[in-house]
UniProtKB/Swiss-Prot annotation:
Limits of the Thioredoxin domain: 72-199
Biased composition (Pro residues): 21-34
Active site residues of this protein: C117 (nucleophile), C120 (nucleophile)
Compartment annotation: Plastid, Chloroplast
Function (record text): Probable thiol-disulfide oxidoreductase that may participate in various redox reactions.
Bias type Low complexity, positions: 1-20, 42-53
Name used for this protein in its record: Thioredoxin-like 4, chloroplastic
Organism: Oryza sativa subsp. japonica
S-S pairs: C117-C120
Transit peptide, from-to: 1-71
Record region (Disordered): 1-68
Protein family per UniProt: Belongs to the thioredoxin family.
Length: 214
């Protein structure tokens, strides 16, 4: 009894010596990869190859070969908190700060600025860094700032009273007295002035008594 087999039959030779060919199979074309994915891989591979070439064949940013490089964000230098540089708007506010500073012997540094001033924006970052590091030197320094343009886009009463004509301008007060004022965008000049007015006073030199000969 002959039963039907579900397995393919092996190729047999015909009587004429030719092998019988297997039945033709239908093949379907492979769909191309998505264009967006292709661009992502190519850009990733190029980024990885450029990173490897720069780092001597290895990844310099922690990414594995063949994978997109890890983007490492540079840590920005930490600035002082907002309350470190206090902004005042009226002459009365400035007077209160100067009075408190007089009681503690602190130096008061005031930055007069204008929002549209490029040099003011430039020195602002350095001024904030000075404020943040002021406690490291053991000296008491109070940092203030004042916008010379009021909400009506006119010169403020404080700027008018103090005759502020140029910005950025820095005032240095101690014991309620204005010691120095100058316009600058040089942080080193501000540092020099702070050090000058916060340096401990040197003790007076002891006078030598003339030796008495007996």
């Amino acid at each position: 009894m002959i039963t039907a087999s579900l397995l393919p039959l092996p190729a047999t030779s015909s009587s004429s010596g030719r092998r019988s060919l297997p039945p033709p199979t239908t093949t379907f074309p492979r769909p191309p990869p998505p264009l967006r994915r292709h661009r992502h891989l190519s850009s990733s591979s190029s980024s990885a190859s450029s990173t490897e070439s720069d780092g001597g064949g290895g990844s310099t940013n922690g990414s594995l070969p063949g994978l997109p490089p890890v983007v490492v964000e540079e840590e920005e230098e930490e600035f002082c908190p907002v309350e470190c540089v206090t902004e005042f708007k009226t002459e009365e506010e400035l007077a209160r700060v100067l009075e408190r500073a007089k009681a503690t012997g602190a130096l008061v540094v005031v930055d007069f600025f204008r929002p549209s001033c490029g040099s003011c924006k430039y020195i602002e970052q350095g001024f904030m860094k000075l404020c943040k590091g002021s406690g490291d030197h053991g000296s008491s320094v109070v940092f203030l700032k004042h916008n010379v343009i009021d909400e009506y886009d006119e010169q403020s009463e404080v700027a008018d009273r103090l005759r502020i004509k140029v910005v950025p301008l820095f005032h240095f007060y101690k014991n309620g007295v204005l010691l120095e004022a100058f316009a600058t965008r040089d942080k080193e000049r501000i540092i020099a002035a702070i050090q000058k007015y916060t340096a401990p006073s040197s003790p007076p030199a002891e006078s030598e008594e003339p030796s008495q000969e007996g």
